[in-house]
Amino acid sequence: RERGLDPLNTNLVVADESRTDKTICLAVTPTLKSYGISGRGRLFEVRQRVREVNAWRQARAPGRTLTGSSHQFSELQRDPALAVDFVIAPPRMAYYMEYSTRIYEIYRKYIAPEDIVVYSIDEVFLDVTDYPYDCTAHELAQTIIRDVLETTGITATAGIGTNLFLAKVAMDIVAKHIPADEN
């Protein structure tokens, strides 16, 4: 968001382009993934897949000509004569750690630290089993997600399950693949 880009509408990869074309992409936005690009691929694989997608788009474009390019998914959906482009953002781990800490503090407003399991810089498990909130797990997740968005401007997703495995499956298989709602 600092760059003025909407992460839900921008084709973006986080990768250190200064290393080599074989560098691993640390993150890939959902819009790029929709073109069949792996979330943990190498930069050369992203470029190769974008070339393939653009060849496909060119073959179907009016006059078989691409008239420009865009990294904005909505523009690409509206105009089939645009080539798919993407932004390469260098990783900024100190910045990510700062945001991760801010988000962790939001979780602590609702859940005690001993019930928070940090899985990675951008993923945690919250055990809400013994909390006397007068709401469902889904409603509590919505409340926390809304707080994260309002406080940081970052969208969040939740997977809910009766154990860690089911929560992880709910996150990876279901939650990350459904359209975002207003909550």
Predicted regions and their residues:
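Gly/Gly-Pro- and Ser/Thr-rich, intrinsically disordered tail segments characteristic of DNA damage-repair
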Residues: R1-N183
